[in-house]
Amino acid sequence: MSDISVEKLTELEAAAELERLARAIAHHDELYHAKDRPEISDAAYDALKRRNEAIEAHFPALVRDDSPSRRVGAAPALATFAPVVHARPMLSLDNAFSDEDVRDFVGSVYRFLGQLPDDSIAFTAEPKIDGLSMSIRYENGILVSGATRGDGTTGENVTANIRTIAEIPNRLPAGAPAVVEVRGEVYMAKSDFLTLNAQMEAEGKQTYVNPRNTAAGSLRQLDAKVTASRKLRFFAYAWGEMSDMPVDTQLGMVEVFRQWGFPVNPLMKRFNSVDGLLAHYRAIGMERPTLDYDIDGVVYKVDRLDLQTRLGFRSRSPRWAIAHKFPAEQALTILRGIDIQVGRTGALTPVARLEPITVGGVVVTNATLHNEDYIKGIGQKGEPIREGRDIRIGDSVIVQRAGDVIPQIVDVVLEEGKKRGEPYQFPHVCPACGSHAVREEGEAVRRCTGGLICPAQAVERIRHFVSRNAFDIEGLGEKQVEFFFNAEDPALCIRSPADIFTLKKRQENSLTKLQNIEGFGATSVKKLYDAIDARREIALHRFLFGLGIRHVGEVNAKRLARAYLSYAAFEKAALEAVPPKEGDRTDKGSEAWQDMLAVEGIGSIVAEAVVDFYGEPHNREVLAALLAEVTPLDEEARVATGSPVEGKTVVFTGSLERMSRDEAKAMAERHGAKTAGSVSKKTDLVVAGPGAGSKLAKATELGIEVINEDDWFKLVGED
């Protein structure tokens, strides 16, 4: 995740980051909701979503069709449980992280409803249970189904397992509405979790990580007897479809649940003021360590149901509710050292080496220090950071697991009488190649000027060059790139992109054969050569993206390719583009410069990056060698002709086993087809894998052709 403030992002940088965030959040949604194997903390996940929402708020025109703000959770991943389409979607809640966020939420409710006096709207406040969301359906008082949230629209049918939870009644009392969907959270008590782990340890089996994942895994057991043995519990707090509403308030409905025999949280209360909500939030936070269940915040809801109806919903969340999350966990440790890492674009990033400390159940040894200003304690505009306290080796520091995938240092604790180390001097020379490291005006990052001669950048740039959305060369993963880069034999080494395409020829004239080296073999080497040869012709936008020009991500590469249509035209423009002289308001720059700025979405920052790249003689040498081996296809000629799917709209659904979603999309586009995320009358073809649910059902209903993954490969001739 970028550390550039949203206000400083260009439109192009924002679009590229939204694309990265959409992929990252979808990945973590699948791990959390569908596989119960989260890789990052809740705080880190929340930070990704906050960043996405902040960028979308600042650039509303860039909101993507696959934006995380338009979806909930992840589609069910297991084909062992039948899909269940929720009568009413199970939406997630927006998050608040500060008192000010809560005041903004309450204010937005009053503004939306209008003309209501202060403190006239009541809100409920209840703990946010860290478990698995569940919808339980009753018809004529009888429990007929239980389903997980899934992606909010379609969940998994876990009825047999739900029936084993003692706290969930199989029948409702007489007088209950004919159709009732009770929603709440399935969880495992901390005490039961400890007992289960003690039992597993005594039996010599692997213990479980945490109650939430254990509860989710227990609920997805194919054998309901296993679920029954896990002592799962339930809190009711919401509802889906109801044939008749017994009461007219949120608190009243929860009381009805209690009367029907459902457990409800005893800490739920109603307040008429923001101060009351915040006081209860703090009270629950104080009580949190003593509770026998995990919570990660407090949920506030408008109490009157008629006001909830008026407020309605956004695309993925209600306007009448919000989750006030607890702050990330922190710990105190010692800063033992500061290392400088050099990234693909030459950015010098400081990383703290810490005395090992446990934060939120995870042992932390490294933390981000962001940039040199953050270490100094003074921002770009002279504003103080941490009240102006700098960070020095040997300091006691507060580490927080939040925001980034790796933790961060949020403060320094100065101990009276303790002598501090010397102020940290941020290097002005690249530690990887010795080139000068410069910091451009207005930027927080210092960068190496070494380009492809810098080993740190060269390896990363080659990895980027062969990555999926660039040249996509199968068989050249991270380890292989590092092997070839570090190879001393001239017949094996790959130090620049062109070296990839001369590898086979160099091998033919060498005594050192790649297939004789450990980790390679005749078959894998042939596949590698075939994969390389398959990319000797490449789509123009992939070629441009693969060059690793700063600020030219996937989005900008496609924009430039569509604008110039051929590589020759683009290169000519890049070489002829001359920006205006600094301080000369009458100078508009060369005609080629003005033409580049006229490309939709391309601003001066991107244009300058392109001009700087082509203005470097070493880069032009690298390009000349590459163009001797590779032909970038003209944009208008790059789509396959004569393909049976050319011009058609294709939807991929279910679990794909032979390719990822990105690969499927790329393959479809390569054959002239368009891909869509949902099925409609405009859809021509649906490719369905195991676990296909609502999209498959809709395709069948509309009479749209449906094929499996193997048939897709045969259809496009890539079997």
Curated annotation (Swiss-Prot):
Signal peptide: none annotated. It catalyses: NAD(+) + (deoxyribonucleotide)n-3'-hydroxyl + 5'-phospho-(deoxyribonucleotide)m = (deoxyribonucleotide)n+m + AMP + beta-nicotinamide D-nucleotide. NAD(+) binds at D42, A43, A44, Y45, D46, S92, L93, E126, R149, E185, K301, K325. Its cofactor is Mg(2+); Mn(2+). Belongs to the NAD-dependent DNA ligase family. LigA subfamily. Keywords: DNA damage, DNA repair, DNA replication, Ligase, Magnesium, Manganese, Metal-binding, NAD, Zinc. Its EC number is 6.5.1.2. This is DNA ligase. DNA ligase that catalyzes the formation of phosphodiester linkages between 5'-phosphoryl and 3'-hydroxyl groups in double-stranded DNA using NAD as a coenzyme and as the energy source for the reaction. It is essential for DNA replication and repair of damaged DNA. It comes from Brucella ovis (strain ATCC 25840 / 63/290 / NCTC 10512). One of its GO terms (molecular function) is DNA ligase (NAD+) activity. The keyword Manganese applies. NCBIfam families: dnlj, PRK07956.1. The active site is at K128 (n6-amp-lysine intermediate). The gene is ligA. Zn(2+) binds at C430, C433, C448, C454. GO terms for cellular component: cytosol. GO terms for biological process: DNA repair; DNA replication.
